[in-house]
Amino acid sequence: MLITISPAKTLDYESPLATEEYSQPELLDQSKRLIRICRELTPAQIASLMGISDKLAGLNAARFGEWHADFTPLNARQAILAFKGDVYTGMQAESFSNKDFDFAQNHLRILSGLYGVLRPLDLMQPYRLEMGIKLENKRGKDLYAFWGDLITEKLNEALEQQGDNVLVNLASDEYFKSVNTKKLAGKIIKPVFLDEKNGKYKIISFYAKKARGLMSQFIIQNQLTQIDRLVEFNLDGYAFDESLSKGNELVFKRPEQH
């Protein structure tokens, strides 16, 4: 079972590390090409391209300038511990055991605009480059064109290495669009998380992101390898709803939070 998740805009390069184990990203040659393109952009162009403030644009221009591919624990951090958005708040990798990190390294992949695909313990330097932005490059008008089938090929390698053909998609649509599902050598399972609001169940972005992290944590800490065990997910009040689940979608519902 292979899990895909999205990266996060919020980064943490300060907290104590939960593991000293690390690996190197496998697509750094591609990352270098993107960095060269990004270094040509002015802070004003970055602000416009990414829809961010001048202050954030300045920070990210500096990050592009300082980025260099000789990653060590002194100038980079393991991806699963560097990202700190809602998904990662739910996953709580800072509390993982060595056994959890080992399982995650084989069964979890983070999709990334700059790095393509990251394993949890791959070192990364700070960046912001969302998959959906229109960054022109020699391969096309955006990052989907840039990455082509490279991300899919890496996921296929991971599926083969870990021994089955099941991919649990916990990434956002923006990121999973980088995967060529026609060429993916696996069956895609998509968990959907519904929260009650005013008596109706719907996807609430903040809760859904956190739930994706909780589901990742559930799979990793229980070392799940069978699809039928996914329906046992019950963290933070979620429960499987068989009547709403169909095809490759597994629906989990939670009563209103007070």
Swiss-Prot record:
It comes from the Bacteria. Signal peptide: none annotated. GO terms for biological process: response to hydroperoxide. Pfam families: H2O2_YaaD. InterPro entries: YaaA (IPR005583). GO terms for cellular component: cytosol. Belongs to the UPF0246 family. PANTHER family: PEROXIDE STRESS RESISTANCE PROTEIN YAAA, PEROXIDE STRESS RESPONSE PROTEIN YAAA. This is UPF0246 protein plu0566. The lineage of its organism: Bacteria, Pseudomonadati, Pseudomonadota, Gammaproteobacteria, Enterobacterales.
